[in-house]
Amino acid sequence: MLMPKQNRVAIYEYLFKEGVMVAKKDYHAPKHPDLEKIPNLQVIKAMQSLKSRGYVKEQFAWRHFYWYLTNEGIEYLRIFLHLPPEIVPATLKRSVRAETVRRGAVGRPDAPARSAEDRSAYRRAPTTPAAHDKKADVGPGSADLEFRGGFGRGRPAP
């Protein structure tokens, strides 16, 4: 599609910076939500062009296109945008997270002490027969089957 070079460069810069691009499947939208002043149609067509050359992978779900840069696409955009190799897309950067503290009874001083015996006490069978309230004759395969015939073609009704 014929589009101004500044629009194509803006699309490629955003794609390289983020590593991904999302666009709603709306060819008549006046502008793309992330790229101001650029029509959604131009974004979709530029990404389709990159997809046909194998520089991005495309996913489509719920009326939205999702494009992910491939390694070849990163190299192509570095050459096209004249970027040094030190600059990488946001998807390749490691996110720095603080060590998360695990919540639970392990770290709380006010939590009651538990042992393995306490946790498995509910699994044990009752010690007295009177306390046993489970039925042994329930479940699949425990009932006696009885075929009495029915309303079929071979036998009339009784």
Swiss-Prot record:
Source species, domain of life: Eukaryota
This protein's UniProt keywords: Cytoplasm, Ribonucleoprotein, Ribosomal protein
Extent of Gly residues compositional bias: 149-158
InterPro entries on file: Plectin_eS10_N, Ribosomal_eS10, WH-like_DNA-bd_sf
Keyword ATP-binding: no
Keyword Cytoplasm applies: yes
Pfam families: S10_plectin
Sequence segments annotated as region (Disordered): 99-158
Annotated Gene Ontology cellular component terms: cytosolic small ribosomal subunit
GO molecular function, one term: RNA binding
Compartments, as annotated in UniProt: Cytoplasm
Family named by the database record: Belongs to the eukaryotic ribosomal protein eS10 family.
Database matches in PANTHER family: 40S RIBOSOMAL PROTEIN S10 (PTHR12146), RIBOSOMAL PROTEIN S10 (PTHR12146:SF0)
Stated name of the protein: Small ribosomal subunit protein eS10
Organism (species): Spodoptera frugiperda (Fall armyworm)
Name of the gene: RpS10
